[in-house]
Amino acid sequence: MKVYAFGFPKIGEKREFKKALEDFWKGKITENQFKEEMSELRMYMVENYRTNVDVVPSNELSYYDFVLDTAIMVGAIPERFGKYEGLSTYFEMARGRKALEMTKYFNTNYHYLVPEIESGNFELLENIPLEDFLFFRSMGIETAPRILGPFTFLYLSKKDGMWIREPGEMEKLFTRLVPVYRKVFEELVENGCGEILVDEPAFVCDLQKDHWNLIKDVYSEFSGFPLTIFTYYDSVSDYESYVSLPVKGLHLDFVSNTENLRNFEKHGFPSDKTLIAGVINGRQPWRANLKKVAELVDKLGASAISNSCPLFHLPITAQWENSLPDGLREKLAFAKEKLEELKVLKEFFEGKKVNLPEVSFEDFAVDESVSKKIKQLTPDSFRREKEYQERDRIQREELKLPLFPTTTIGSFPQTSDVRKMRARYRRGEISEEEYESFIKEQIKKVVRIQEEIGLDVLVHGEFERTDMVEFFAEKLNGIATTQNGWVLSYGSRCYRPPIIYGTVSRTGPMTLKEITYAQSLTEKPVKGMLTGPITIMGWSYYREDIPEREIAYQIALAINEEVKDLEEAGIKIVQIDEPAFREKAPVKKSKWPEYFEWAINAFNLAANARPETQIHAHMCYSDFNEIIEYIHQLEFDVISIEASRSKGEIISAFENFKGWIKQIGVGVWDIHSPAVPSVDEMKSIIERVLRILPKELIWVNPDCGLKTRNWEEVVPSLKNMVDLAKKLRKEYNNT
């Protein structure tokens, strides 16, 4: 039995990656010092592999993003960045003023930089995999370089602002891209490399027959090289074509789907290739039931095993988690522990006496009263009492808002003072009373500022919240937060996903104190601010033995209890943030109807409010076209969307959807940029929207929360936004 593993987190046990990268950006360390620290992290990653697996991967530590590294390797550098000058160009592409677009990697919480293919004149600019291979070779360590495959690279790229997905377009680009990959492989083999690991996760997407013909042509060009292909996140879309590729070995993910196993049983597996069975879950942090896993490996007759997908979706180790609920830590396996599980499986198949644990979750942290509530749900639980048109009439009478009402998305700048006070409170250096008094002062200040600016619907600023998911996770039963469970989101940004380990329920009000205090300071409506069930679930780890639908409904019930408390306290507008609604959708569109059915139900269960309560939904996407029909089924009254980057073009999704009647908060200010938008810039976006939607449906707001901006940017931008609304009212009030 041979053990492969891949994607070990580069972050470091003490987030050394983040510190070194940010120190380099700030000029605190030189380029050489930065590279030395990265080399130490490389060695740390490889030592973890060497202890547990047979095939040690290299080329796994990117200075920012592995897709960007691939773009550099093949010379896909847009003209605006000029001649490639090493790290200065690299980080300009990653985070400069004209940086590449960033988006989610398949349906995960990792973000990658989208390559821009301009001329299609690829060249081998820098053989990064070879450099890493030779680095380890100089240390006496043999590795198998890991490379993003050519098909996935193009599939994740854009040309002229459009995704490169059409087979004819891909074929043209492959004529120039394939020779570059050949050169990379040739140089590796010439230097004694015995195996090259090629990641092709795009093979699991909705591909046509023409795509697979193209894939076969591409890989026939590589038939002499020792390639092993890795696929993950779902089943390969054409099993028979996949297993016929002329390569040394093929990895299949047997965790995320059932189709790979069904296809294996139906079509078998070629005897001239190595089957690498991805049987240890790389996305969820639970210890595997190794007895069951061993039975599956036996059934497959696999001669090699691995994790199902990259381990960078997990924290490094559960070893230092000392404040988790009783009985939880021993059920956890982070990246290091996953490698150990693979080693135990290998020893078992080699006939060594090892214990294959059977982890049981059956009765762990279960609350039957919540299960009972879910069983009692009826179709009316997922529908509001009155239809939208009737709710709209009631709400307009109740709220008496002007035309083009203005608001923000929720958070305001979290200054270093706010972060310091929160840290002091968590360390026990100040009392709860002192901390709450400080938060009240911040709320009072932000309400005053919003009133002075002239916003119509106010927010409390979210100064008490570190993170929109972690805040609720800390207040709900059945969800744990970690001390050191850091995962990389993009660049140097890390977050700690909460762990949904039991039945989720609410212990008491979570947001009431701060929101009702803010409302007491003003006559204007203050929005209640909640995170939706799909986002809490999608940005957390959760149990594998409980259906996703049930977990989502548990969270939705808890959020709905909060909505009802806010209503009782006189709050007339409640916003439910659901940025994960689209991104949690399965990779394959054939699985969308089932997912969206329960995702829509979960939102509607959470949002089941009185007719006079105006429910806002916030979703920060730039592409609604694919999911507009599903969004239309959500029971909100107003949806706020990003519109600034697309200059209002996002609204075409609503133009193409006949029968749209709900209100839309148009994000006219791109908060990801430090620039203060002018009234005219923002007006052009609203005018684009007014070509399609009636003026009565339009709100004016930033496209996202303002937590990461500073006050010097926020105040003038919001003033311009309010001036815009006043200008629009003058212009359109009598039309």
UniProtKB/Swiss-Prot annotation:
Keywords: Amino-acid biosynthesis, Metal-binding, Methionine biosynthesis, Methyltransferase, Repeat, Transferase, Zinc. 5-methyltetrahydropteroyltri-L-glutamate binds at residues 15-18, 104, 493-494, 539, 583. It catalyses: 5-methyltetrahydropteroyltri-L-glutamate + L-homocysteine = tetrahydropteroyltri-L-glutamate + L-methionine. GO terms for molecular function: 5-methyltetrahydropteroyltriglutamate-homocysteine S-methyltransferase activity; zinc ion binding. Zn(2+) binds at residues 618, 620, 642, 704. It comes from the Bacteria. HAMAP family: Meth_synth. Belongs to the vitamin-B12 independent methionine synthase family. This is 5-methyltetrahydropteroyltriglutamate--homocysteine methyltransferase.
